[in-house]
């Protein structure tokens, strides 16, 4: 946390800076491909999957497979969420879900930590200034004193290079960078809007290596995307330079998250191909209702096409009057024997129905084709003659003798 006063913070917010990469990154964010890969959209989908009742554990491998991204992208989101208390690390690639209700407590802790950090840095700077004045007086009185005696003093501080290296290594952490970024807003009432460039200068310092500075600015921009998707900050721009900036909104209740259209289409494809069986009951209800409708339609058609008994008997009598009686009708060489037709009464004016089993047993026609009868009798006589000759020449062995 920086030890700048509120007046200097105001100047830092409104002062222009020269980092063109951040503005170009914001322009790329509005393109289609960049938007689909942004951490903001990914965080919205992540929260839509896990911000609901019944979720206690979050697995990074499971989240990466459901969202269709690499696990390192999930790490970025989890680090930011962990810094504001939404998640807590439990094991490797396993996190405990705390929810948005833990955000106010985490922000309060960050505010208290930021105030203590500001007071500590102010106290250290005052001590360093006093020790520098004493060192100047001693060096003027003893110009040839060795550096070892200075380092052996009990009140001397360690060299500034070592703690700066430690701080630089710690600030590479995305979670720590997120906490320091939030402290800029909650530890000073003067700051409510800050540009991305000024936040990078306050948190990262003036780096001489431009490539390292670009990387750190991109990391800070990813943090801002995640916090913006959580409605903690809002993307805006400065009034003087129109550069990208961020406005602090704070925690105003739990927001509502919905899956993106791409993931919704993916879920619909899964249901279509049978990998998701949540719509089995719907399919069964549809099939049962359709079968009932088809059965009803068939019954209506049968009633519509059914012939009353009186009309059926009338048409049958007309047919007999045209072709004569059943006894006088000639069926050709295959004349059926005399038989009676079933005279069972009709029910519900439906079509006359014949009993198939009774037809097979009682009303089997007896064909009287003399030519075929003579031919079959000739074949039977020939077979009997051949069989008698064969049995006489080769008599069958007596099976009783072998017993």
From Swiss-Prot:
GO terms for biological process: DNA endoreduplication; negative regulation of DNA endoreduplication; regulation of transcription by RNA polymerase II. It holds the Pfam family E2F_TDP. Expressed exclusively in mitotically dividing cells. Highly expressed in young leaves and mature flowers. Lower expression in young stalk and in young and mature flowers. GO terms for molecular function: DNA binding; DNA-binding transcription factor activity; RNA polymerase II cis-regulatory region sequence-specific DNA binding. Residues 34-99, 169-250 bind DNA. Residues 128-167, 282-319 are annotated as: Disordered. Keywords: Cell cycle, DNA-binding, Nucleus, Repressor, Transcription, Transcription regulation. GO terms for cellular component: nucleus; transcription regulator complex. Disruption phenotype: No visible phenotype, but increased ploidy levels. The keyword Glycosyltransferase does not apply. It is found in: Nucleus. Gene3D superfamilies: Winged helix-like DNA-binding domain superfamily/Winged helix DNA-binding domain (1.10.10.10). Residues 153-163 have a biased composition (Polar residues). Residues 142-152 have a biased composition (Low complexity). Belongs to the E2F/DP family. Inhibitor of E2F-dependent activation of gene expression. Binds specifically the E2 recognition site without interacting with DP proteins and prevents transcription activation by E2F/DP heterodimers. Controls the timing of endocycle onset and inhibits endoreduplication. This is E2F transcription factor-like E2FE.
């Amino acid at each position: 946390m920086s030890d700048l006063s509120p007046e200097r913070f105001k100047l830092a917010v409104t002062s222009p800076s020269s980092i063109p990469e951040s503005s170009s990154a914001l322009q790329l964010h509005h393109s289609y491909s960049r938007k689909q890969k942004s951490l903001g959209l990914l965080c919205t989908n992540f929260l839509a999957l896990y911000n609901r009742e019944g979720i206690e554990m979050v697995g990074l491998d499971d989240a990466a497979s459901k969202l269709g991204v690499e696990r390192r992208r999930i790490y970025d989101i989890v680090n930011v969420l962990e810094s504001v208390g939404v998640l807590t690390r439990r094991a490797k690639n396993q996190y405990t879900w705390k929810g948005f209700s833990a955000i106010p407590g985490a922000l309060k802790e960050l505010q208290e930590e930021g105030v203590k950090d500001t007071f500590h840095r102010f106290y250290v700077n005052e001590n360093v200034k006093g020790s520098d004045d004493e060192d100047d007086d001693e060096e003027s009185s003893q110009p040839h004193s060795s550096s070892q005696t200075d380092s052996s003093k009990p009140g001397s501080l360690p060299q500034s290079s070592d703690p700066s290296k430690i701080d630089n290594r710690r600030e590479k952490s995305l979670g720590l960078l997120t906490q320091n970024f939030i402290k800029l807003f909650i530890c000073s009432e003067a700051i409510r809007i800050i540009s991305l460039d000024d936040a990078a200068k306050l948190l990262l310092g003036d780096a001489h290596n431009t490539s390292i500075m670009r990387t750190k600015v991109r990391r800070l921009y990813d943090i801002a995307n995640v916090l913006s998707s959580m409605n903690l900050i809002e993307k805006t721009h400065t009034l003087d330079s129109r550069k990208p900036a961020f406005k602090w909104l704070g925690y105003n209740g739990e927001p509502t998250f919905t899956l993106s259209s791409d993931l919704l289409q993916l879920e619909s494809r899964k249901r279509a191909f049978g990998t998701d069986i949540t719509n089995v009951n719907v399919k069964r209800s549809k099939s049962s209702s359709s079968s009932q409708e088809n059965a009803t339609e068939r019954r209506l058609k049968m009633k519509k096409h059914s012939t009353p008994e009186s009309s059926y008997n009338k048409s049958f009598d007309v047919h007999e009057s045209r072709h004569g009686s059943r006894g006088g009708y000639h069926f050709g060489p295959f004349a059926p024997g005399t038989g009676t037709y079933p005279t069972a009464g009709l029910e519900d004016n439906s079509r006359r129905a014949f009993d198939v089993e009774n037809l097979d047993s009682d009303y089997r026609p007896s064909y009287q084709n003399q030519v075929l009868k003579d031919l079959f009798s000739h074949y039977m006589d020939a077979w009997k003659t051949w069989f008698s000759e064969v049995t006489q020449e080769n008599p069958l062995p007596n099976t009783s003798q072998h017993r």
